């Protein structure tokens, strides 16, 4: 009887195996579609391949979630100003992963083909003449500024924006890879890449938000830029790699307001590849690693600078005497543990009206500085090439 039971069991297993082999395996199609218009409620796009058409505005009370691994493609050929814009009160959730980033790109792979990601909040700003509100320079003419230091515009993690930085036809308005207007400290910005845009990689217009693990690669204007009294104080691991065309590694200004506060950024790598020219050509002297102007200030530590060796370029440029008097002599610019890897001079002013000298301890060097420390992954790879240099 035991032998009979065993034989029947083997037959049953064999039949089950045959049945399994004959089953059809089906795969679900990858979602596609167009993201366009205003978003006024909660909207989620699952992992898929989408197009963006026109300026998509996330209105107050609305939210947009795009799942990890998705690709969103703009097109200069559609004749619209493609951009993703978060208005104050709206929220954007792009929570990619190292292996599955959320990628925004453009069909022709032409720098400046679309407007990138733009976010507005109501965190504090200090604009020209001390004003606390201002109008955006992205062509949308939206007001920004407020008193909400903890403004929360959502979460951006492992996001790559390619070929953005659209310049508008009025010759004054422009967009960047990422533009943050009075964004607050409740917003999460981590592991973001701005790749080959026609303007700045990242620009902060006031606000209190901080950003971790940023890569600005091959952008035509400045790699990192801010104004309007931006005061994010928990920034770390910023990498700029300028190649072919690029201006300043970091352009730092405060609209000529002598603020008592400033941002803090630790672990910075600024690299300019050989042969890189400024956006304006040989006539534009915008080739320094770091420029302070109009009372820009802040504390920057563990900084590694390489390749800024164009004639007359310098690691740190103080652009005007007011900035030197108020911020350098006033002790509100600190550059700590700076390592210069080549013949780039340490710092210089403009003209002959002042000679740059820092108070003791406010400019220090170190041969062991490491700069940005970033973890490799698909989030930082384009066309098979790692952006982490």
PLM regions: where:
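Extracellular beta-rich repeat passengers
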Residues: 25-27, 32-46, 52-59, 64, ...
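Catalytic metal-binding/acid-base residues of hydrolase active sites
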Residues: 71
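Bacterial Sec-dependent N-terminal signal peptides
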Residues: 1-36
């Amino acid at each position: 009887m035991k032998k009979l039971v065993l034989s029947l069991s083997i037959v049953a297993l064999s039949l089950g195996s045959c049945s399994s082999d004959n089953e059809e395996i089906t795969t679900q199609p990858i979602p596609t579609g167009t993201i366009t218009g205003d978003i006024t409620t909660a909207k989620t796009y699952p992992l898929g391949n989408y197009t963006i058409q026109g300026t998509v505005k996330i209105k107050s009370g609305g939210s947009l979630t795009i799942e990890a691994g998705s690709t969103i493609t703009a097109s200069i050929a559609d004749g619209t100003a493609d951009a993703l814009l978060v208005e104050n009160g709206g929220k954007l959730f792009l929570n990619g992963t190292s292996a599955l980033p959320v990628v925004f790109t453009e069909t022709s792979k032409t720098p400046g083909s679309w407007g990138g990601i733009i976010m507005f909040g109501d965190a504090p700003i200090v604009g020209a003449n001390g004003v606390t509100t201002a109008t955006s320079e992205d062509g949308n003419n939206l007001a920004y500024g407020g008193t909400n230091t903890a403004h929360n515009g959502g979460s951006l993690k492992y996001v790559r924006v390619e070929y953005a930085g659209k310049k508008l036809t009025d010759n004054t308005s422009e967009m960047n890879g990422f533009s943050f207007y009075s964004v607050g400290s409740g917003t999460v910005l981590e592991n973001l890449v701005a790749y080959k845009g026609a303007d700045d990689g990242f620009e902060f217009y006031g606000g209190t938000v901080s950003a971790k693990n940023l890569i600005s690669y091959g952008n035509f204007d400045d790699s990192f830029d801010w104004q309007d009294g931006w005061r994010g104080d928990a920034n770390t691991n910023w990498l700029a790699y300028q190649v072919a065309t690029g201006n300043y590694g970091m352009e730092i200004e405060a609209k000529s307001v002598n603020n008592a506060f400033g941002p803090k950024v630790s672990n910075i790598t600024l690299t300019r590849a050989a042969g890189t020219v400024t956006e304006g050509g040989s006539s534009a002297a915008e080739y320094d690693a770091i420029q302070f102007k109009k009372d820009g200030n802040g504390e920057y530590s563990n900084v590694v600078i390489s390749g800024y060796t164009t004639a007359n370029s310098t690691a740190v440029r103080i652009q005007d005497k007011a900035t030197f008097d108020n911020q350098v002599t006033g002790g509100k610019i600190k550059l700590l543990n700076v390592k210069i890897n080549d013949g780039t001079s340490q710092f210089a002013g403009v003209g002959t009206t002042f000679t740059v000298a820092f108070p003791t301890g406010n400019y220090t060097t170190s041969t062991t500085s490491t700069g940005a420390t970033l973890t490799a992954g698909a989030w930082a790879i384009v066309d098979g090439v790692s952006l982490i240099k």
